[in-house]
Amino acid sequence: MTTYQRSFFCTAASAALFAAMAITSPVYAQSAPSAQLEVQKAASAQKQPLLESLKEFVNIETGSRDMEGILQATELLANKLRALGGQVQFIEPQESTAYRMMDTPEKIGRMVKATFTGTGTKRIMLIAHIDTVYPKGMAAKQPFRIDGDKAYGLGISDDKQGVAMVVHVVAMLKALNFNEFGTLTVLVNADEEISSPGSRAELTKAGGEHDAVLSFEATRTNSDKLSLATSGIASVELKVEGRASHAGAAPERGVNALYELSHQILQMRDLSQNDKGLKLNWTVSQAGTNRNVIPAYATAQADVRVLRVADYDGIEATVREKAKTQLLPDAKVIVKFERRRPPLEATPANRKLAAHAQTIYAELGRKLEVDDQPEGGGTDAAFAALKTQAAVVERFGLQGFGGHTADNEYILLDTVEARLYLAARVVMDISRGKGL
């Protein structure tokens, strides 16, 4: 008998225990039908298997440029999803649809897609990412370990927990013999940390084909919540081409690229509109090769954040128009504007689903916050929402801390069962036409 089968069949003593819990617990005694107790038991049964999966995923290094690790981890994930009955395929990035940016590697990691077919009509998608920000070789500094109420490991919060959550939400549904959805799709990419250059097109396409999308980025340790909005992220790269000359003997023969770059940065320093959540900040610059040479080349980069997809057009047009006003007419100014990630915007659909999720969480006696304002970061949920009016909600993952830190990334163990319960119940209710 498998672990999942053992979790599904309870002894008479166990049944009596849960019946007693239903009577003595104010939440369950007042409102929860027996089906919810079965979901709670299924969530409890999946906690240890989830931690075992999490250990496997964490101990495989999957930096976005580490193709060896990504191949190994995606194969592991595919095998787990096949074992649960999914029709699994690998989706290799296509050059024709990839959005290459200044830091996009030549090779982009593949996606794992699994499809589960049910008896209903609703189409639901669960998404997460398996890549991390860490260079190869750093896992030895933070291997998977459990210490008290925390599980530590490289990439455990961002976003290995999300991958494990998706797997074990599906395992819960299988253990409960629940198949009332029409299609349940799992989509996990391996290039999120480099702005999803190869997977964004598939995420957007798939998002438009589903009635709801649950994204499994972690929530905060100090805030048990779901997110309805994330920031859009863009970058501006300015390149100035001038002409080199001796700085002492013949500076007038040169065209100082640094002067022109400085002029451009200064005339674009006040483009932020904080009341609209639009931010443009110059953060990186480089010019010159030697102290005694007029620089022929200079570059600068700016970080851009927006709250609405429509804001991209306006800020890009402003930057390009400003760049036409030059200090040195003989310099050549080149502007590159990269839309690295769209914003996820709060909509009536995701507000309604999040409100329904709050009622589900309350069945456990827990309060679920819903945040409709972005924190400054961006996620793949925005790509899934880009061409659809369906509900797309972020942060169905565990409570975690320390993403992008090499020595202190962890998840809170006491959130595993509650978050499994929440996600599984949301899938079940959507399948039955509730929450949308």
Per-range role (PLM):
Residues 131-147, 214, 227-239, 359:
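Acidic-glycine-rich active-site phosphate/pyrophosphate-binding loop
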Residues 9, 18-28:
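C-terminal segment of classical bacterial N-terminal signal peptides
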Residues 152-233, 273, 435-436:
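Acidic/histidine-rich catalytic neighborhood of metal-dependent amide-processing enzymes
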